[in-house]
C-alpha cells in the first residue's frame, strides 16, 4: 500500500486537505447523510463509528483531513446507488476496520479518485467482491495496477499464498470488469484460464519443477470453460503409465494443497468428493 501511494503521490502530488469534506459538527453530518438518502436507522447505527475513528499517523491533522475527505467522497459515491446505499455504508464500516485507518490508505484513494468510484461500485453491486476487499485490503495495490508481484522462491507455503492471491485478484479484477460490461462469457473464460494456470503451477510445485507425470482432464463447468465465482473443480487424473505409489502420493498432495484452508485467502478451490466416477463406486 505504501509503495502504491508513493508512486501515485510522486506522479500527481499530495492532495489538498482543503478540498470537499464532511460537515464539521454531528447535526450537520446527520443532515448531510439524510439528504443523501441514508436511512435514520443506518445513520444512527453506523455513522458514529465511522466518524470517530482515528487515523494512525505521525501527522495527525493532515491525515485526519485526508480521512474525512475520503469519507465524504466515498459516501457521496455510494449514495448514487440508492437501492443498496445503506448496505454499502455498512460494508464501508467493515472495510475501514479491516484497513485499521492507515494514512497511506486514505492517501491512495485521494490521489486516485477513480478508485473511489470503482470500489464504491463494487460495494453497491457485489457483496461477494466487497468481501474480498474487506478480508484482503492489501489487494488494492494489485487491483490499481491490474498486476501481481512475481513470486521469488519455491517454498510450498509461499507458492500457495501466491496462488491464493492470484485467484482472489482474478475474481476481483474480472468481477469488476463484469459489473461494467455484463459480459458473462468473458468472465467465465478468464476465471477458467486462472484455474488452468493455478492447477498447473500447483502440479509443477508438487513435482519439484520437473515435467508433470500427473495430467489433469477437467470435467463439469471447468471442462466446459464455464467456471464462475466460487465454483468447485471436477476433474480426473491421467497417467501415461500404470499408477505407482509415488503417483498416488502426488495426487493426495495435490488434493490437500488445493483444498486446505489455513492460508489467508482460504482454500484455492473446493472439490465435491461426493461425486463418484463409477456410480456407486468410491472415490
Regions found by a protein language model. Name each.
Residues 1-283:
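Non-catalytic regulatory/linker segments of enzymes
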Amino acid at each position: 500500500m505504501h509503495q502504491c501511494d508513493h508512486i501515485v503521490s510522486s506522479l500527481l502530488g499530495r492532495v489538498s486537505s482543503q478540498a470537499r469534506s464532511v460537515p464539521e459538527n454531528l447535526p450537520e453530518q446527520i443532515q448531510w447523510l439524510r439528504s443523501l438518502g441514508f436511512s435514520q436507522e443506518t445513520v444512527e447505527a453506523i455513522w458514529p463509528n465511522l466518524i470517530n475513528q482515528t487515523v494512525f499517523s505521525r501527522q495527525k491533522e493532515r491525515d485526519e483531513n485526508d480521512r474525512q475527505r475520503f469519507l465524504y467522497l466515498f459516501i457521496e459515491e455510494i449514495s448514487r446507488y440508492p437501492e443498496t446505499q445503506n448496505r454499502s455504508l455498512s460494508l464501508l464500516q467493515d472495510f475501514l476496520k479491516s484497513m485499521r485507518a492507515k494514512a497511506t490508505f486514505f492517501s491512495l484513494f485521494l490521489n486516485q479518485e477513480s478508485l473511489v468510484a470503482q470500489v464504491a461500485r463494487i460495494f453497491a453491486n457485489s457483496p461477494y467482491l466487497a468481501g474480498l476487499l474487506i478480508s484482503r485490503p492489501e489487494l488494492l495495490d494489485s487491483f490499481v495496477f491490474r498486476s501481481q508481484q512475481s513470486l521469488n522462491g519455491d517454498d510450498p507455503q509461499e507458492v500457495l499464498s501466491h496462488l491464493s492471491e492470484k485467484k482472489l485478484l482474478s475474481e476481483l479484477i474480472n468481477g469488476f470488469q463484469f459489473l461494467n460490461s455484463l459480459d458473462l462469457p468473458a468472465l467465465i473464460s478468464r476465471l477458467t484460464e486462472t484455474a488452468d494456470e493455478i492447477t498447473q503451477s500447483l502440479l509443477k510445485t508438487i513435482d519439484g519443477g520437473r515435467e508433470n507425470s500427473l495430467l489433469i482432464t477437467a470435467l463439469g463447468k471447468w471442462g466446459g470453460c464455464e467456471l464462475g465465482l466460487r465454483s468447485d473443480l471436477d476433474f480426473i487424473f491421467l497417467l501415461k503409465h500404470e499408477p505407482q505409489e509415488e503417483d498416488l502420493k502426488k495426487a493426495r498432495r495435490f488434493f490437500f494443497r488445493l483444498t486446505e484452508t489455513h492460508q489467508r485467502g482460504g482454500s484455492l478451490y473446493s472439490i465435491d468428493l461426493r461425486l463418484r466416477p463409477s456410480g456407486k463406486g468410491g472415490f
